[in-house]
Amino acid sequence: MKAVVLAVAVLFLTGSQARHFWQRDEPQTPWDRVKDFATVYVDAIKESGRDYVAQLETSVLGKHLNLKLLDNWDTLSTTFSKLRADLGPVTQEFWDNLEKDTEWLRQEMNKDLQEVKQKVQPYLDNFHKKMQEEMERYREKVGPLGTELREGARQKLQELQEKLTPLGEDLRDRAREHVDTLRTQLAPYSDDMRQRLTQRLEALRDSTTFADYQAKASEHLKTFSEKAKPALEDLRQGLLPVLESLKASILSSIDQATKQLTAQ
């Protein structure tokens, strides 16, 4: 299972680098993407959660039970923010170490990508050239038909459509042929890249780096657990006033209902 987790993590990291290698953009680290998503998600939950709490407190049941949930909601939000802040550096350190430990693998994969790119570039250039020629050929055949339409008005529109249909179908069929040819030409290189990636992952699995990573991952989980304990305890303490208030309100309502039944 650990090997699967590591493989996915490596693919995630190298995949990100490979995508930016082709696009030539500045890569965003995996932790940055996680932080961006988590921040937006948590902020949305905080806002929507406060709305739900306000609705519950102002409802008939909330008024009857004399709930004071909003008094504690801001405290809970602060507690969640503190929890996120406390655990953030630990996770950041983990991603930094993982990126550093797999830097050699990313470099090897980038070399492989560069080599494959150089090999397939002639096929891509030829494909682009063929498609340009097909489009020029199509324009040369369609151009006179446009002139004919302008000169012949509406009655020739149907004739123009009949003439354009086979031309469009011919262009489509020839384009498909070029795409199929390109796919056939690139297939060996795709298989080669897949085989290279498999070899890199097998080498990683058999290397001492993998054993070191397992030890570091265990250490990280232990540190994460130790860091999380006080933060989770703060969260529990923040929840206690809400639970106690709700418990007291419910017991009070039950007591009042019992007295009313006894009086009857």
UniProtKB/Swiss-Prot annotation:
Q: What is this protein called?
A: Apolipoprotein A-I
Would you identify the family this protein belongs to, as annotated?
Answer: Belongs to the apolipoprotein A1/A4/E family.
What job does this protein perform? Participates in the reverse transport of cholesterol from tissues to the liver for excretion by promoting cholesterol efflux from tissues and by acting as a cofactor for the lecithin cholesterol acyltransferase (LCAT). As part of the SPAP complex, activates spermatozoa motility.
Q: Give me the segments passing through the membrane.
A: none
Q: Which gene encodes it?
A: APOA1
User: Which Gene3D superfamilies has this protein been placed in?
Assistant: 1.20.5.20, 6.10.140.380, Apolipoprotein (1.20.120.20)
Signal peptide position in this chain?
Answer: 1-18
Region spans: 10 X approximate tandem repeats: 67-264
